[in-house]
Amino acid sequence: TAEHLPAPLAPATDGQDPARWRVLMVILAAIFMSLMGVSVVNVALASIQQALNASQSDIQWILSGYALTFGVVLVSAGRAGDLMGRGGFFMLGVTIFTLASVAAGLAQTADQLNLARFIQGVGSGFINPQGVGMIQQYFRGAERGRAFGFFGTAVGVSVAIGPVLGGFLIELGGNSLGWRLTFLIDVTVGLLTLW
């Protein structure tokens, strides 16, 4: 939780505090989860359409709704984190995203799934600016460069692995269950991040 995050670093630091690297792993796990949520669903769209008898418009909103709410929340959530503390907003974002992933995985209609995707976008909009801000807050100098290098790697891998993981989950669960697994997989990552 937010109270478990170490205090922000002073401008000059000896770089020996290992807690900041644990914080980075938590940040990267959450950002990985939220960005994978964009790409993993792409391969599940046909299964979703069939299972929920969704229209083409419903399918478009599954993708667009997430991006829309993510974009709307992103800047204001980042500013709120700057003013009121990043840790709490980060954990709020992870909680929102995780709960919305449960709702998406259990959705019985296209409308329910779209609502869950809108809410996932809100959660992701909270997670991402706080993660970047906390990297800047906890790391200095060359260590900041390394931390952002890990961040960039997590972003790239999450987007690349999403379709592969989505295909695997659909193959594993079939058309009726596999698409649900593409959302429920985020619950595991979210719970580990919150823990």
Task: Annotate the PLM regions.
Residues A2-W195:
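Transmembrane-helix bundle of Major Facilitator Superfamily
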